[in-house]
Amino acid sequence: MEFDELMQCPYDKNHMIRPSRFPYHLVKCRENNRAAAKILATCPYNARHRVPKQELDLHMASCEYRVTMEPISAAFSHQKVETSTWQSPPCEEVWETDEDPVSRPKPFILNDFTPSQPFNMSEGDGNMPYTGISSNYRPEVQPMNSVMQVKQNQPEPEPFTSSERNYDPRSKEPPNPKQPAVNGYKPATTNTNPWCRQTGGSRGAAPPKLGAKSSDEGPRNKEFPTPKANLMNEYVPVAANANPWCRQPGGSSAASEPLGVDSFDEWPCLGRQPWVRK
């Protein structure tokens, strides 16, 4: 950096500052040198120029940043400013005094307000006041004896029956109409359990199949006899889970004896006859 590019501080000649930092340095150095700041004056053409107050006029005459300025005319300096004649309107409210607690403000009433037109009137009668409802109307209080007499004259409501449990007041159909019989079967209720026996001996809501006339004659209600099992080698069949080594009633065992052994006494592999339940 060359020495010519630096600028000398007017408050301290030992300070050499770059031109880009010179305005910031002047503000900071002026605070540190208040005595020198009272002697120096600022040039009106360039704020970086600080000269003694006695030499300010000479500097302004020879400053390189001096520009031509138009002189102020005498007519312009003596021109009077026209004052406005506008005045604020008078205010009725007085803010200095306290509010009068006795006075009450008037209610706000709209001048163009018209009453609403009733539904059953024409457009010509819409401006007429509606006098059907009055604030002074009070319902007549009936004596106690007349109320009791009215209740006695009213018919008693019919008791609630189970046939009206599914009644819908919005529908025009009667509650739970009678359902026609299909093939001679009685219709069952909607929420009945098909596995619980109903009154009359019927077991399920669905009609039985195979041409039965009623639910009592259905195939599920009958008890079929157990078919006789075929005898194999003249032995009586026993239960599947019976102990094959215990003698069954009638002298037969559960396991088949293909070798012709009839009891444990004839079994050659058993050294001692076990105890057999009889």
Swiss-Prot record:
Entries under Pfam families matching the protein: zf-U11-48K
Keyword set, alphabetical order: Cytoplasm, Developmental protein, Metal-binding, Repeat, Zinc, Zinc-finger
Subcellular location: Cytoplasm
Residues noted as binding Zn(2+) 1 in the record, renumbered to the chain: C9, H15, H25, C29
Highest taxon in the source lineage: Eukaryota
InterPro entries recorded: TRM13/UPF0224_CHHC_Znf_dom (IPR022776), UPF0224_FAM112_RNA_Proc (IPR051591), Znf_C2H2_sf (IPR036236)
SUPFAM superfamilies: beta-beta-alpha zinc fingers
Biased composition annotated in UniProt, kind: Basic and acidic residues: 165-175, 214-225
Zn finger residue spans: CHHC U11-48K-type: 6-33, 40-67
One GO CC annotation: cytoplasm
Span list, region Disordered: 149-230, 249-278
Disulfide bond residue pairs: none
Binding residue positions for Zn(2+) 2: C43, H49, H59, C63
Function: Involved in oocyte maturation. It is possible that D7 is required at a certain point in the maturation process and that maturation cannot proceed beyond this point unless a threshold amount of D7 protein is provided.
Record family assignment: Belongs to the UPF0224 (FAM112) family.
Name of the protein in its database record: Protein D7
Annotated source species: Xenopus laevis
